[in-house]
A protein has these predicted regions:
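Short, glycine-biased loop/turn motifs at secondary-structure junctions and
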Residues: 1-95
């Protein structure tokens, strides 16, 4: 599975979600998972930041694993790597 996420800088990054990862998609487009790998940073090689926590950094080929992933399916805004299923949805997301 591939996911797309907008960073604090407004850059859409691409992540792969590995087999075996927990993925919750409550409304069909916005999802969250416990594992991801950043595979593209929109042509940027520098560090990009989370729009939620600007201390959290994204780097190319970085593996992300959320240790305190919230296992409650019905809680959309909980701990996890949040992403959209399409690039277009991520681009439209207001950071």
């Amino acid at each position: 599975m591939t996911g797309f996420k907008k960073t604090k800088e407004g850059i859409v990054i691409t992540a792969t979600i590995p087999a075996g990862a927990i993925v919750f998609c409550i409304n069909g487009s916005k999802c969250r998972t416990n594992k991801a790998r950043i595979i593209d940073m929109g042509g940027h090689n520098e560090v990009l930041h989370s729009s939620y926590d600007d201390k959290f950094e994204y780097r190319l080929m970085q593996d992300i694993e959320i240790e305190d992933f919230n296992l409650l399916y019905s809680v959309e805004c909980a701990s996890g790597f949040h992403f959209f299923r399409t690039r277009e949805e991520a681009e439209k997301y207001n950071v």
